[in-house]
């Protein structure tokens, strides 16, 4: 006759009463407590949005994504690609409340857009500053992937300063300082929140670049300007120079003479553009613009907002080993 094996459960020194809620809280590790706290704080401010837009063949296309309430009167941040061609839309919140939304403005070159709820919405989320993020820092993504409302994933900042090439009409640009994270993102997360451990929104989730790799547009001083322009004008006015460039390191002698380690090599100057009219030539090495050092396309783009349109735009370039001063007058970039 076989006998069942006997197992002795060691005494943990506590009585056998059922665990209390306080016991459960104490058992949670610090990581879980942070994620839970941020999820509970951020989720009410994030909406699932459904958008209806027209295809070229006249048929209607229904898309979905996420949006984040960021003002007390119902304005929400999302991605420009989520609301492209929108005819109508609806936002649904975690508490079950719904509202129709209207498009306020979109900027394809930053992949940011603003929509407004036509009925009362939950209070706004708190916006943070992505410039304070560090690689390895914990971040929490809240969105509506695959139609699953209020989904939360957590990960770390895998990289900072990444760039996403984007195109709007005939213009190409890069979204600068993009946040790379390993927090799981899926279709429907676009437009959702990326929050830090204090529940502040530091990014708007925008793309899935591959398995285990998500990207978010940062919330920082540059994007705050974009958001302000969308609220005010429904679009972002940008200045246009008309050049194609690539960053290169300076040789040792140039570093000594200029005090810079990098510059922008001009690859192409567009015919008839402000850059050509200024005298800029292919092969020139741009060192400074408006008196500020430039070492990447992003650093130059940051200077080309509406206030630069039609105004003198000083350029310092290195040409054949000599420093040359040029003055360009940027025009307004067309929206087409």
PLM feature spans:
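A structural signal for short, hydrophobic beta-strand segments that form beta-sheets
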Residues: 103, 157, 266-269, 286
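Short, structured beta-strand/loop micro-motifs enriched in basic residues and often containing a Trp
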Residues: 119-124, 264-270, 293-297
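PDZ/PDZ-like domain micro-motif
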Residues: 190-193, 249-257, 270-288, 303
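Serine-dependent protease modules
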Residues: 2-262, 305, 321, 332-336
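PDZ-domain C-terminal substructure recognizer with occasional recognition of PDZ-binding tails
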Residues: 228-235, 265, 277-281, 287-293, ...
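Residues at or immediately preceding the N-termini of alpha-helices
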Residues: 130, 220, 272-274, 297
């Amino acid at each position: 006759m076989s006998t069942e094996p006997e197992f002795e459960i060691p005494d943990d020194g506590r009585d056998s009463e059922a665990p209390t809620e306080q016991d459960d809280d104490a058992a949670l590790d610090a990581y879980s407590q942070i994620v839970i706290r941020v999820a509970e704080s951020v989720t009410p401010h994030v909406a699932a949005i459904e958008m209806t837009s027209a295809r070229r063949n006249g048929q209607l296309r229904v898309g979905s994504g996420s949006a984040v309430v960021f003002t007390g009167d119902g304005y929400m941040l999302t991605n420009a690609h989520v609301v492209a061609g929108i005819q109508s839309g609806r936002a649904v919140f975690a508490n079950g409340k719904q509202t129709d939304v209207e498009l306020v403005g979109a900027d394809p070159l930053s992949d940011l857009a603003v929509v407004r709820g036509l009925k009362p919405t939950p209070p706004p989320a708190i916006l943070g500053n992505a410039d304070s993020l560090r690689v390895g820092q914990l971040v929490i993504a809240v969105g509506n992937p695959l139609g699953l409302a209020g989904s939360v994933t957590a990960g770390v900042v895998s990289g900072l300063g990444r760039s996403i090439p984007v195109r709007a009409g005939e213009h190409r640009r890069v979204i600068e300082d993009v946040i790379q994270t390993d927090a799981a993102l899926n279709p429907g997360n676009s437009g959702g929140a990326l929050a830090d451990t204090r529940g502040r929104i530091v990014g708007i989730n925008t793309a899935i670049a591959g398995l285990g790799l998500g990207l978010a547009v940062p919330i920082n001083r540059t994007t705050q300007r974009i958001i302000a322009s969308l609220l005010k004008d429904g679009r972002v006015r940008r200045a246009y120079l008309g050049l194609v460039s690539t960053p290169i390191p300076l040789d040792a002698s140039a570093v000594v003479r200029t005090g810079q380690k990098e510059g922008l090599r001009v690859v192409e100057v567009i015919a008839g553009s402000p850059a050509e009219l200024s005298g800029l030539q292919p092969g020139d090495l741009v060192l400074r613009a408006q008196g500020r050092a430039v070492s990447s396309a992003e650093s130059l783009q940051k200077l080309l907002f509406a206030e630069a349109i039609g105004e003198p735009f000083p350029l310092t370039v290195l040409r054949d080993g000599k420093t040359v001063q040029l003055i360009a007058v940027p025009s307004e970039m067309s929206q087409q």
